[in-house]
């Protein structure tokens, strides 16, 4: 879990996501899976929010799906407060595309 965290701290979100995907796939039953999904959400959030308009909507929708997966697998996640704040921002951004 160190490498994905290092990528995240140096703002290399794409590398962090790739590394986290590898970790999640290789260590399915890991006690760090919840944290890995959370960091994947954070990295995806940064990419989606700062995306160009042509890619933003799809990235926001993917992020919403990732949030739903986290909440489904970890209904009492330790990161619920932060996830709730960020998903509200995501939903506001998605709504701007509806208008």
Regions found by a protein language model. Give the residues of each.
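Acidic, polar-rich low-complexity tracts and alpha-helical solenoid repeat scaffolds
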Residues: 1-99
């Amino acid at each position: 879990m160190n490498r994905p965290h290092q990528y995240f701290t140096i703002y290399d979100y794409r590398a962090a996501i790739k590394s986290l995907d590898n970790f999640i796939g290789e260590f399915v039953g890991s006690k760090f899976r919840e944290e890995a999904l959370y960091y994947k959400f954070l990295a995806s959030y940064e990419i989606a929010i700062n995306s160009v308009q042509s890619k933003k909507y799809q990235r926001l929708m993917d992020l919403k799906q990732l949030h739903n997966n986290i909440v489904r697998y970890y209904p009492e996640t330790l990161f619920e407060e932060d996830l709730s704040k960020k998903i509200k921002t995501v939903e506001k951004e998605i709504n701007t595309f509806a208008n």
